[in-house]
Amino acid sequence: MVSFVALIPLFPIVGFFLLLPLGKKLGYPKAGWLGTTAIFLSFVASVITWVGLLARTGTHRVFVDHLFTWMNVGSLKLGIDLYLDPLSMTMVLFVTGVATIIHAYSIGYMKGDPRFHQFFVYLNLFVFSMIVLVLAGNIPLAFVGWEGVGACSYFLISFWFEKPSAATAGKKAFIVNRIGDFGFLLGSFLLFYWVGSLNYVNLFGGHLILSKGSATAIALLFFLGAAGKSAQLPLFTWLVDAMEGPTPVSALIHAATMVTAGVYLMARLAPILRLAPTASMVIAIVGVLTAFVAAAAATSQDDIKKVLAYSTVSQLGYMFLAVGTGAYVAAIFLMVTHAFYKALLFLGSGSVIHSMHDEQDIKKMGRLRRYMPITSVTFIIGWLSIAGFPPFSGFWSKGDVLTAAFQKSPLLWLVGALTAILTAYYMGREVMLVFFGDSRWSAISGSGHQGGHEVGEHEGDMHVSAPHESPRIMTLPLIILAVLAVLGGLLNLPFASSTRFL
């Protein structure tokens, strides 16, 4: 099993280095398929590793694959170590799985873009960085992956840098995240100063000795880092502007990489949070306030992608609410199910934008279910999932979070429940305005792409005058994600103990 672990990050970085010199020569669609294959092979290696890990029990489910020594300076001893446990394997499974689907979708969506190959160069590097963050066996190596996803988000958000708004959004994301990085670094320094190690085996392998004050300071500093990366109050504004990037980038950032990094970090540091009840309560309060404020903001948005952007901020708030109340499994469970339905919703919005010739104003849409049956049905499934309707995956995962919140504080539960009602409302509003009602798109011009090009496949060389279903390379990923959004709740059902892995 260990021999397959190193292959998980190896395939994406090999894809990156192959696409750098060969991508332009390969062109469309070969460059896209090369990048997609690299991520798919990483997913296969993840599945094989997961099966091997599943066969183990207890402490045997935690082990380290030491590749080589990185630093050995005084008492600081660090290696390039891959840390395997149920948490890291759960993360790497959904990261590589969802990323594979998004890569395949991008082949159709980015057709015609002059820098088609460059897009997949960045995507492969993005996924590699996230895998390094998740599998890192020590905090400094995790920080390398942490910075890697930050850099790649800058490249991809500002991919259409010809648009001033895209270039500005990329810079904003990069700068805001530097604020969080300060907390990550300072927390790392204090942890090493007080504990004497930054290796996970030493930190979490036995009894962690920290005073309550020290644990609180470290936890809050790492939470500052997580708040920047995972868009919590007041550092969430960059994520809304990140919609300037191509829609597959939005799906990747919001579902599988980047914003999930902060939640993962806090779940990984759970032994420290258990020693810091004050910090945990701060995390829960910030999380539930972020969830409510973002949900309220989403109710007034008319841009199809900005509704989803605020929705992501809100759902991340739920995850931090779970972390703050000590429900770490519930936080990761929500993260996994959220990856399924949020990737589905973003890719579905991309299908709509593609069909509407770049129009993103939901008040200029309507009745698209008649012209886009696959997109409409799958998008509705995503809506039912995020709204928490049974038996869709969001019902089970969000229910776990609210249960934990009620046990901690009825007030936290009340705000979380109100947020759930707002979520059902603003997503229902988007569905109704886009797919139902009267057609409001007759005035849309079919003369060409606007501004920075939301590029997709066209019929011949001309834009069609009426909306149309997207090509199969774009609709098949929607169907797969819709199935996962329906069945994802089976991963952690309370009455099915055999499925409980975390």
Task: State each model region's role.
Residues 455-458, 464-502:
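Hard-cation-handling environments
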Residues 97-145, 151-464, 490:
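Hydrophobic transmembrane alpha-helices and their helix-loop junctions in integral membrane proteins
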Residues 3-17, 41-44, 48-51, 407, ...:
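Membrane-embedded helix-loop-helix hairpins and adjacent transmembrane boundary segments
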Residues 28-42, 170-181, 370-378, 468-483:
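Alpha-helical transmembrane segments and their helix-start/interface "positive-inside/aromatic belt" motifs
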Residues 37-54, 180-189, 382-386, 477-496:
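Hydrophobic alpha-helical membrane-insertion segments
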Residues 9-24, 100-101, 227, 291:
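N-terminal signal-anchor/start-transfer transmembrane helix
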Residues 4-7, 14, 18, 34, ...:
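Residue-level signal for short hydrophobic patches within transmembrane helices
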Residues 1-6, 22-93, 97-121, 193-212, ...:
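Transmembrane helix-loop-helix hairpins at membrane boundaries of multipass inner-membrane proteins
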